[in-house]
Amino acid sequence: MQQRLPSLLEHPVAFAHRGGKAHAPENTIEAFRLGLKLGATGLESDVWLTSDGVPVLEHDGVVRSRFSRRAIGDLRRNQLPSFIPTLAELIDECGTSYHLSLDLKAPNVGLRVLDVVGEVGPELLPRLWLCEPLWQDLLPLRDHAEGAKLVDSTRLSRIKEGPERRAATLASEGIDAINLHHTDWSGGLVTLFHRFDICAIAWDLQFEHLLRPILRMGIDGVHSDWVDRMMDAYRAELGAPQL
């Protein structure tokens, strides 16, 4: 059996992707509650801004009806379906005893996220992970992060300068983590980013036979739709989950 490599985090994070979309309608309070009930130590979602500046959790950023499609950014909060939760509602309903990873989907949404979390759940800030596909878009958040983690969410094939140069750049620019598809990761690549104190996160891990080897690589976080499978693998490799 592969020897387990060390993680940067004392307790790697098990993120329920969109709340654990295999178990309940994605990005709903029902899904987020269930993901935590099934043992996830983190929740994942996408965050958009309504036209009146409210951060809401939804994947596509589009509200569909029988005859139309409207962008969330063109609608006020009170025009959205009730099943689309606001960030504040997530915190009100689920508390703050978990990690929260958010893909930032709208201009300036990161600053509003930090404002809302600071207002309604400041104890969540050290466990808040803010993700962008262009790491440069995270730079305006550095002076406002209040302990939140900034995450370069990309693919290995897009890192044209090579992973070592990217790791060095992220470290020098104050970015905390990199999030790659699980097929991009190897034990050596995890170790490389750890040398620069960059956390290594993996996504799209739907089966135990994929989860267990990547946890042994020393990965710092995993994302899965199937929370039960993820937690079975986590306990088998790392023991009881903790924050």
Enumerate the language-model features and the residues they cover:
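Phosphate-group recognition and catalysis centered on beta-loop-alpha active-site segments
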Residues: 1-243
